[in-house]
């Protein structure tokens, strides 16, 4: 099923013409409304007229998460707040969240691209969809919600967590589709199996995203639940879920090219790479009103496929994310930077920042453990005081990253010191 | 009296490591106890030379600390411990932890209290003998 055949199956020449036109309009809008970009363009000696089409895209400056942080919270918005109808946020690199905004048109475009994703996965108004992404500042819940409403599916807005309720809804309300993180769906599958409820559910398809996952996980999910597992990709800075999506052929995610222009760059030289190469994925938002971004560096590694897909869509496809160019971790769908944990430890002040982060997947749920060296300065010879310290560190980290963490105190000098850039993370999830 | 307290992770061989270091530094252990939690323990020792034990263990990167404790000698007969605790409790002292041993006619008790100075004074007034 194709939601918007006119756009999704447009030939390359036409889509590039549309992109060029929208890019030029965007550059003008941004130049006059976002001082941050105007300054950047002036430094580069770039004038509005220098961008005549997508062939000039490489002349524009890059944008990073740090830029958004430096302009926290609303500094990069291109419209007055009276036109912003919603704000979302995701974790930043050091504790300050990355804030994004949407106008009414932005929300409408967002619903449109999620509707395309749902149709791509075969979900229509005949379906009931259990939306188990968190509703709130996180874009997952409300993003999926808007698209599901647009296609007219019956939404069961469960939001994240509360496994008991999730299972009850799967059994009693008989949804045919579910949207959540792949690891959470595996966890739900385990629970259904344990309670011998697998034959009581009507699920047919799952729309999964917000964290990296492998082909092996896909196979596991499809086998355990006897459903199709479809990938949806997105990031709040660009829009949220729906920036790209897999169709039922599961061979790369179709990018909504009428809204976002993708590029693949070399993360070291920052030069665009030839078609088909693997590198860092970069997006320029050409229709966004509230928060238009030039060449946003996702730090995700991928490559682009330009051939027409078997499904008939001509839109460019991105291959499954193979890694990141920074040290960001995605744990239970939440972005976590080691620097956030470091800043939590520094705020406590009693610990020297020698720590190690261990990420693991136990029973299909991501676990986060932080080992902290016990400094002599605060070593107490009473267990109760050490336990109080553990609780204090745990609370501080949870306050900053928003997900649960286990803190373990270890002896001084037992965490490996490395020369140069310290290795702070051991990820045992094999993803 | 100075007790030495050492932070030790719960893993095989760690206690062994401490005793090896102390032996190499020519230090004799007089009394010991281990307080344990799930992941780590605190080893508390009375040793022949607390200051030098502290230096030796610090050099080997252990988190160590000297703690004031009171070590009392009593007769190994029933009611001895009760008499000490009565003196402390009547004096408003709370015991944070304690350990002890008995051999032959003598028993030794080691206390960590919230107020070691007052506790020593009270015990002295009541004619208890220190180790």
Predicted regions and their residues:
Chain B
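A conserved regulatory-domain signal marking ACT and ACT-like small-molecule sensing domains
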Residues: 1-131
